[in-house]
Amino acid sequence: MKQPFPGKHWNKVTECTSSIYSELHRIALLYGCEASTISKKLEEKLEAVEMWLLRRMLRISWVERVTNEQVLQRAGAKREMMKSIRRRQMRFFGHVMRQEQLENLCLTGKVEGKRGRGRPRTKFLDSLAKFVGGANTPAGLIRKTADRAEWRLMVANVLGDTAPR
């Protein structure tokens, strides 16, 4: 890897570009992810974009055959994209479920009308219950959101955080 700014200034340039990455690109990628269902295919694409941005930031070409783990090590970063998306989704879900508004009805699937032919679309609530895992059903998740302290503790446990946010 050739350094565009050789010497002691290279670390400052890397720090600056990593802060730009974390502030601007992640915000653009995570915009509106709270209310969308993330499929396995979309999850893989988001992780690929995250790695592509890190490679661009460090000026590592695909031709150099540097593994993703080495790129993460050089950048001093971790794969945080999906964890951040899931955290946002769970916070959004808990917030919406404690209110009696239209968003609540949409997320719980209580919308009138006929469903189209074919395979049912994956619901947001089902994908969230699948992510949380264990014996948590969509109905169980809705019940747990009523107690804010219990919900925050569960979110922290599922995401592996040390303290609830």
Locations of the language-model features?
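Short linear motifs embedded in intrinsically disordered, charge-biased segments
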Residues: 1-165
